[in-house]
Amino acid sequence: MEQLCGLFGLTRQAWYAATRRQEKLGFQAAIVLTEVKRLRKQIAGLGTTKLYELMQDFLASHQIKLGRDKLHKLLKINGLILTKKRSKIKTTDSDHDLEKYPNQVKELKPTGIGQLWVSDLNYIRVGIGFAYLSVIMDAYSRKIVGWSFHKTLEAKGPVAALEMALQMHGQTNQSLIHHSDRGVKYCSGAYVDRLRQAKITISMTESGDPNENALAERVFRTLKEEFHLWGFPSFGLAETAVEQAIRAYNSLRPHASLGYKTPDLAHQGKGYQPLKWYPYKKVRFGNVHYQADNLSCSPL
């Protein structure tokens, strides 16, 4: 051993110290990867940045010093970097004779909850067909305040989501704007009448550009990419997955625009409050492939 150490200009003590250090780093890597796997069981599509933010308390409690770049390297070594591909089916039918409303939110920047709701509808594959998820989100807190999962594209789905949002919102004298695309569901008599009854100002996109309703579009990108709401063999399984995903989206998933706080905390006025809102930021849909079976415990 002394001859071997001498070849590298090391003392026996230095060699043992280096070996112990490598063993410690390998053990820490295993701990980190185990926590990554646990978090991705809750939100399968968590990327490096959100994982890093969620793991701060965990790293501190285990006395592990790990930066975001090193975490990214560890994920890459173990094949845990997420990849995406585009996938989108048109669900907006704006070619109709129903009354359309002007865009009221082009320059609007909400300063609190209950000022602006954004709404949209998207598909989820069920069996050989599709079911449709309607959501309403508070633009300030990013909290999904209403949702409905429906087997058809009828207005019943969006109306049910609206009723849930109204029940959560309660009675208030504060002015509220509801923004959506110009699809036939949101222009229908049942939906418009309910908004008017609740004294909510109606706002709609003025073109087919999805960037005019970017916040609502982004919700579906997140739900599909990070919670893997792509396809299910039955409506019941899909509905259960949707409910679990929305609950986790509101209570567990950190948002960059909220200072990496959750929508629930922002909606309750706790912690960091939103400072930025980008109504026309471009979004895209995509798929996520994730494999985390064989973890390599390379040193951090």
Name every feature range the model reports, one short phrase each:
Residues 65-135, 157-164, 168-169, 173-175, ...:
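Mobile-element integrase/transposase regions
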Residues 138-139, 149-154:
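A short acidic/small-residue loop/turn micro-motif
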Residues 4-5, 15, 36, 51, ...:
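Mobile genetic element proteins and their domesticated derivatives, centered on retroelements
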Residues 3, 10-14, 31, 161, ...:
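Generic alpha-helical secondary structure signal
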Residues 196-200, 222-300:
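C-terminal domain-tail junction helix/linker
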Residues 91-94, 180-182, 188-192, 202-224, ...:
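RNase H-like two-metal-ion nuclease catalytic core shared by retroviral integrases
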Residues 5, 9-113, 267-271, 276:
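Basic, flexible linker segments flanking DNA-binding modules
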